[in-house]
Every structure is written in structure tokens, then in C-alpha cells.
Amino acid sequence: MAVVKSKPTSAGRRHVVKVTNNDLHKGAPYAPLLDTKSKSGGRNNNGRITTRHVGGGHKQHYRMVDFRRNKDGISAVVERLEYDPNRSANIALIRYADGERRYIIASKGMVAGNIVFSGADAPIKAGNTLPLQNIPVGSTVHCVELKPGKGAQVARSAGASAQLVAREGRYVTLRLRSGEMRKVLTECRATLGEVSNSEHSLRVLGKAGATRWRGVRPTVRGAAMNPVDHPHGGGEGRSKGGRHPVTPWGVPTKGYKTRSNKRTDKLIVRRRTK
């Protein structure tokens, strides 16, 4: 994997920094594991915008990634690593001994030819998936379940990981990259190691159009709008009326807590620091 800076042959190329990986598959993805992906443009069934800054972008196929890793006791060989337009991490196409193929999130250091396992008896090796009760304290994990059997929900993006810092009774304690310490049931599964493509954060798109290719529309400052559109709108010159920064709906936007799920507060040992 290499970080390549473009030569300034044009204004749009001047700041581009790409992350290249010669180990990724050059051909088409595995067709039986593809699904259609329709775009909503951020609108709901009434045609109203419910998610801002969404629209356009290149047409994509969804890769059906196995986040449960529930095929226990059967070895699988990594056939190839692939690019996935739907996520920052790379994915791996694995083939089980019985012939079934699945996509999984590729872990750091995974290459074609690796053997991976899942289940309580799987070896302690990067890329293998085990229940948290079978993973040694101090291990680095990713693709962590929050409910047994539901599938991985935590630490799935490029370079992400969590550390298993304690085990007590029915729960283990994980330290997440955000600084949050969280309890998770020991029956939940996690994959050993870190997520691949950690250099993803080093890339620079270089121009607004590259962001539009990804289906992201521009973000307009509230102070640049009219009073009818935003609490900061209007005024002569640059002015936001002297009030603290808020969203278009008047909710404070810097440091204001909006988390409403009190039921799972008991599982958060320490709040995130970033």
C-alpha cells in the first residue's frame, strides 16, 4: 500500500493524494454476493429532504458482507481482497471448505491464501472471529457485536479497532478509539486484529467534484442564508445575530448532548473523549 501525491498538472490535480493498493482484485466483484442499491437523494416517501447533503454520485452495487461470521468449525481460505465503494475498509472474498463464498471485512495484514476460522475453538489469530469470552484480555479486536447474533456494529471502518481491557461476570469491557469504555456481553462475537486500509485517513480528494462523485452535496453556512432558512441567516454583512451556534432547527451545535438512549447508559463505563 502506497500514498501517491499527484503532480499539479491542473487545479483539480494539485492537492490530490491517493492511497494505492496493488493487492486489491482488478476484476469485477463476485456477482452472487451483489445487490442493487437505489438512491433516495436524502428524500423520504413524501419527497421531503430528511437527510441534508445527500444526492447524486456514481451508481454502486451493494456487497453483501457477512457481519455475523456464524459458520463455525469450517475453515475458509481468503481468495482475494477487493475494493468496496460502500465503506472505507477493504473487503475479502473467502471460500469455505464446503464451497460457500462470503465477503468479510478484511483485517490488517490479511492477504490472499490466508486461512480464517470462526467459533469458540478458532485459533487466536488476526482475522478469526470468536466470542468475547474466548478472547484474551488485552487483545485488539474489530467488528464487535453489541447483541449476540445480531452482527458486528462497532469498529468496522478503515483502521478501526477496540481493546479488550477487562472481563467481569457476563460482561467484558472494551476501550474504543473514541476513548469510550463500554461493557459488552461475553457471548457477543468480535474479530481479532485491526480493520484494513488504515491509510484511508491520509487521502485527499483534492477538489469539490470528487466529493460529488461520492454522493455528497455542498454544505451551506447558516450565516450565508436568509432568515427564513436558518437562525443565523440575514443581517447586514457577516452577522449571526449574536446567538450561540445552532442547527437550522435551533438546537445548540457545539458540545450539546443529544444522546437519548438512556436504557444503555448503564453499559457505558466512561464517555467518549473525542
Swiss-Prot record:
Entry protein name: Large ribosomal subunit protein uL2
Compositional bias (Basic and acidic residues): 229-239
Compositionally biased residues, Polar residues: 39-49
Region of interest (Disordered), residue spans: 28-59, 222-274
Pfam families named in the record: Ribosomal_L2, Ribosomal_L2_C
Function in brief: One of the primary rRNA binding proteins. Required for association of the 30S and 50S subunits to form the 70S ribosome, for tRNA binding and peptide bond formation. It has been suggested to have peptidyltransferase activity; this is somewhat controversial. Makes several contacts with the 16S rRNA in the 70S ribosome.
Any single GO BP term: cytoplasmic translation
Gene name for this UniProt entry: rplB
PROSITE patterns attached to this UniProt entry: RIBOSOMAL_L2 (PS00467)
Subunit structure: Part of the 50S ribosomal subunit. Forms a bridge to the 30S subunit in the 70S ribosome.
Gene Ontology MF terms: rRNA binding; structural constituent of ribosome; transferase activity
HAMAP family linked to this entry: Ribosomal_uL2_B (MF_01320_B)
Similarity section: Belongs to the universal ribosomal protein uL2 family.
CC per GO annotation: large ribosomal subunit
SUPFAM superfamilies (alphabetical): Nucleic acid-binding proteins, Translation proteins SH3-like domain
Gene3D superfamilies per UniProt: 2.30.30.30, Nucleic acid-binding proteins, Ribosomal protein L2, domain 3
